[in-house]
């Protein structure tokens, strides 16, 4: 049985768990919430949900989860919204990425909460558009070697993959479309 951990310190944790349970139904997966250290090393994959990147970054450090993520960086990971920032090279006085994906990001690239929106994205790995939900979303400004851009919006990349790491500017867990969660499970074979 494969275990997927969902960092459960902020964000749409329950929605990610529900989506993962739906796409893994009938398969050999177990989904667990991670609030404290000592669990990540038993996981075969990890989801870092959205939320407020400063808060998530601080809580990851406070709980020691940042070190556990780095120690287990070989496992598949999906970061959504603020989770994208955590996977990236992002650095400022308030939040710090873990540098697991070679990309530079911009926080709140699409405005504040009131400017949240949905957009039908053309995604490289899907046959039809994905209705992406952007809420105070970050954007990928620049990618390094080994990054495969899966989707763009305006001048920014908003979905990217590097090996078995998947970073999304938007919130697939808030949609009824489960394709990104299914795609994440495919990363377990790569």
Spell out what each predicted region is.
Residues 53-122:
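Cysteine-nucleophile active-site neighborhood
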Residues 47-49, 134, 167-169:
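Structural motif
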Residues 1-3, 127-130, 160-166:
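Beta-strand-turn-beta hairpins that frame and shape the catalytic cleft
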Residues 94-156:
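Pocket-forming structural segment of enzyme catalytic cores
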Residues 1-62, 68, 178-182, 186-190:
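N-terminal beta1-alpha1 cap of cysteine-dependent amidohydrolase-like domains
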Residues 11, 139-190:
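C-terminal and late-domain segments of enzyme folds
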């Amino acid at each position: 049985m494969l275990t997927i951990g969902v960092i459960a310190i902020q964000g749409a944790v329950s929605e990610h768990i529900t989506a993962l349970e739906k796409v893994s139904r009938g398969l050999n997966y177990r989904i667990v919430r991670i609030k404290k250290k000592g669990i990540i090393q038993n996981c075969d994959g990890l989801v870092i949900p959205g939320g407020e990147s400063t808060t998530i970054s601080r809580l990851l450090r406070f709980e020691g989860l940042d070190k556990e993520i780095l120690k287990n960086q070989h496992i598949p990971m999906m970061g959504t919204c603020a989770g994208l920032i955590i996977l990236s090279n992002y650095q400022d006085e308030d939040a710090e990425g873990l540098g697991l994906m070679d990309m530079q990001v911009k926080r709140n690239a699409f405005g504040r909460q009131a400017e949240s929106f949905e957009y039908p994205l053309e995604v490289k790995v899907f046959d039809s558009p994905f209705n992406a939900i952007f809420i105070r979303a970050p954007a990928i400004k620049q990618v390094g070697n080994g990054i495969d851009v899966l989707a763009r919006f305006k001048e920014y990349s908003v979905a990217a993959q590097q090996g078995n790491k998947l970073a999304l500017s938007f919130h697939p867990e808030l949609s009824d479309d489960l394709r990104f969660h299914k795609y994440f499970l495919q990363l377990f074979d790569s």
